[in-house]
Amino acid sequence: MKPIWHLFYKEWIKTRTAFFCSLLVGVGVVFYIFIGVENKITLMGAKNYTLNILYSNPPVIYYSLLRYLPLLAAVSIGISQYVPEVAQRRIRLTLHLPVGNRTLFIGMAFYGLLLITIFNAIVLGFFLWKNSFIFPSEVTIPVRHTVWGWFLAGYWVYNYIAFTALEPNRLRQLFYALTGLIVLSLYFYDVPFHGAYGSSTP
């Protein structure tokens, strides 16, 4: 068990700056979103602004700043974790830890996914909590379905970074990168209405 904790500590040293910067930006963006929302409520009144969100065409996507935030967090964590291993050839040192290679790579992936889960739990949880205090369920439920898709995309992009960085074959790297871009594009269509991804999210 000790080698796994040593591995986690090594990964933490590499990724802590990216993680805390992403978390700070994420929480700051949520604060900024709701400062804007409260200003609009002050100017228009709560009822008028809520009706504007529900019935305007095109829709008022007041939370649009969240769209690429989980993606950027996952990219920064993934790059800080895997690029030094490959670019500086540290992966050879990592492979000399007294752990099987499969266990090693699973541990690295688990660590990264755990960081992304913590980021998502804090930022998304904070956003949904603030949202529920300001808007009725007619707004909060469709909005929740929409932003879930964006936060789930972070897991995909992290995995594709890991696959691409650790793959020694250039053609497979290209295949992983192109496949990743195609899959990720499904998460970032323009949102035509609140709850646009409701049928495909829990």
What are these regions (language model features)?
Residues M1-Y68, S80, L166, R170-P202:
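Hydrophobic alpha-helical transmembrane segments
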Residues K2, L69-L72, S76, P84-Q88:
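Generic alpha-helical scaffold signal
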Residues P3, Q88-R92, N159:
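Short, well-structured alpha-helical interface segments that form or flank functional binding sites
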Residues V30-I41, N48-A74, I106-R170:
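Secretory targeting signals
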Residues Q81-Y111:
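Helix-loop-helix units of permease transmembrane domains in multi-pass membrane transporters
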Residues V99-F119, F188-T201:
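C-terminal halves and exits of single transmembrane alpha-helices
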